[in-house]
Amino acid sequence: MVGRVVAGGVPIAVEDHGGHGQDVLLLHGGGRSRGDWDAFAGLLVGNGFRPVAMDLRGHGESGEAPWSWREALGDVAAVVEEHGLHRPVVVGHSLGGMVAALWAGEHPECPLAVNLDGHGNPTRPDQFSGLDEGRADDACREMTAFLTEMGRGLPEWFLQVMREIDALDLFAVYRAARCPLLVVSGDAAAFAGMFPERLVPAWNAYCLWTRRQLEAVTEEPSPVRHASLPTGHDPHLEDPRALLRLLLGQLRPA
């Protein structure tokens, strides 16, 4: 059943997939829509959950509006309230995963938040592990230029999304988590295909930096855990059953 929730004057499209049991709120990635979750939502219903998926502002059938993390979290809160979701598990992919991680910092009652392969983009030379200072500076400059060129012609609201991502310190967000937070990584090598060959070493260096930062966070006393799946950037589309098993393992430990 598809409905609308108005959050701060913005209509937010919401799809309740039915089912009974633990509520699960599903957040899609940037430039995508709630339909990405259809197959996974069906699996959740069959395993005793009630999944609800929403279109983030500016996406799918939701209204376009200024974009910020605070406004996105307000939209999520409005959906939770209007649909009567009780302490929902919040699972997000990419952009939605970052929203889920921020939710974890504000909702200690949340049983689990999941960031599914939402690692952001490199913005500083120190994020290119294994490259010396000069090569790291060059890698950062070339990567920034490439990503900027990719953004040409995109609508302003989406460019604002990208600026919000670039300004977010995800590892500070992880360290601020107040409920269990699972960060899931796909195979970063599969994502390297979007870059020209000259930038693949830089991308790999950034992925190495990300893994090391995640290892540091999970070694600290914190509610953050990390897991990997042998998929690309879209585990919920490529292997939804593997993602379900991972989720069940977190919520129903043996």
Identify the role of each PLM range.
Residues 92, 96, 100:
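Gly/Ala-rich beta-loop-alpha elbow adjacent to hydrolase catalytic centers
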Residues 187-231:
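Conserved loop-alpha-helix segment in the C-terminal half of the alpha/beta-hydrolase fold
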Residues 42, 46, 53-91, 231:
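Active-site loop/oxyanion-hole signature of alpha/beta-hydrolase fold enzymes
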Residues 177, 183-185:
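Short beta-strand/loop motif that positions the catalytic acidic residue
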Residues 101-105, 110-142:
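Flexible "cap/lid" loop of the alpha/beta hydrolase fold
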Residues 156-173, 209-212:
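Active-site nucleophile elbow and catalytic-triad environment of alpha/beta-hydrolase enzymes
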Residues 221-254:
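Catalytic active-site module of serine/aspartate enzymes centered on a nucleophile-bearing elbow/loop
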Residues 13-61:
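Conserved HGGG/HGGXW glycine-rich cap/lid loop of the alpha/beta-hydrolase fold
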